[in-house]
Amino acid sequence: MTRQWEILREYDEIKYEFFEGIAKVTINRPEVRNAFTPKTVAEMIDAFSRARDDQNVSVIVLTGEGDKAFCSGGDQKKRGHGGYVGEDDIPRLNVLDLQRLIRVIPKPVIAMVRGYAIGGGNVLNVVCDLTIAADNAIFGQTGPKVGSFDAGYGSGYLARIVGHKKAREIWYLCRQYNAQEALDMGLVNTVVPLEQVEDETVKWCKDIMQHSPTALRFLKAAMNADTDGLAGLQQMAGDATLLYYTTDEAKEGRDAFKEKRNPDFDQFPKFP
């Protein structure tokens, strides 16, 4: 099915589009298998932040341009002494900020993977909430081959997903795994023919959009809290505070302060 995606904002190295409640962020560097630069990542951070704040967006899809690659990680040609060097000549590892943003956005983020999801590209797949893989998808880590590694979500959280033994295999041997192997180890949620991957992804998005956004927000925060320590707890606590602010009980405290009177909290139930 052909869809008319609406361009929400123009970028140099990514696309940011919208269709019926779905925001789609596409890494647009197919000539290098959608490897990212500091600029690519900065643009993705901006797009994801806009999707987070947009009340018309219910689900976010992350993908790569073309059928050959989702993302092949950091562009090694941009790698300098202390990180990946952008136009400002400052070495950065700002993809770590993007990983955290994807985790804390209170909306489901789905990776739509076609072709290679390698290195930092596989880590982006890992931090997304769900993954729809085309049958030509290839996953793997290359860090130890090129003098790099991801000691955060790319290893610790990966081990939670596929198990410690498998995660060590993935990192120590730097092998590549096809879509079926990724499905078998729990790295993706489903595998579909390449020509159906967008249709299936949109279907999953539409199914998700039938459900309570507040419930989904808390479920994401709860599952993140299990792996993200105090930062994860902060996310869930912040969501709880936001929900509390919408209650009459919280509004009574606020209004009493503004009206310079004592709050009447006795009117509210004390549930067991």
Swiss-Prot record:
* InterPro entries membership: ClpP/crotonase-like_dom_sf, DHNA-CoA_synthase_MenB, Enoyl-CoA_hyd/isom_CS, Enoyl-CoA_hydra/iso, Enoyl-CoA_hydra_C
Biochemical pathway: Quinol/quinone metabolism; 1,4-dihydroxy-2-naphthoate biosynthesis; 1,4-dihydroxy-2-naphthoate from chorismate: step 6/7; Quinol/quinone metabolism; menaquinone biosynthesis
Q: Which PROSITE patterns match?
A: ENOYL_COA_HYDRATASE (PS00166)
Q: Where is this site: Important for catalysis?
A: Y84, Y245
Q: Which Pfam families match?
A: ECH_1
Going by the UniProt record, its keywords in alphabetical order are: Lyase, Menaquinone biosynthesis
User: In its UniProt record, which GO terms are filed under biological process?
Assistant: menaquinone biosynthetic process
Which amino acid positions bind hydrogencarbonate, per UniProt? Q141, T142, G143
Annotated GO MF terms: 1,4-dihydroxy-2-naphthoyl-CoA synthase activity
Q: Which residues bind substrate?
A: 33, 72-76, 84, 116-120, 142, 148, 245, 260
Q: Which GO terms describe its cellular component?
A: cytosol
Protein name per its UniProtKB record: 1,4-dihydroxy-2-naphthoyl-CoA synthase
Identify the cofactor(s): hydrogencarbonate
What the protein does comes down to: Converts o-succinylbenzoyl-CoA (OSB-CoA) to 1,4-dihydroxy-2-naphthoyl-CoA (DHNA-CoA).
Catalytic activity, EC: 4.1.3.36
For this protein, what reaction is catalysed?
A: 2-succinylbenzoyl-CoA + H(+) = 1,4-dihydroxy-2-naphthoyl-CoA + H2O
Could you say which protein family the record assigns here?
Belongs to the enoyl-CoA hydratase/isomerase family. MenB subfamily.
**Cross-referenced PANTHER family:** 1,4-DIHYDROXY-2-NAPHTHOYL-COA SYNTHASE, PEROXISOMAL, NUCLEOSIDE-DIPHOSPHATE-SUGAR EPIMERASE
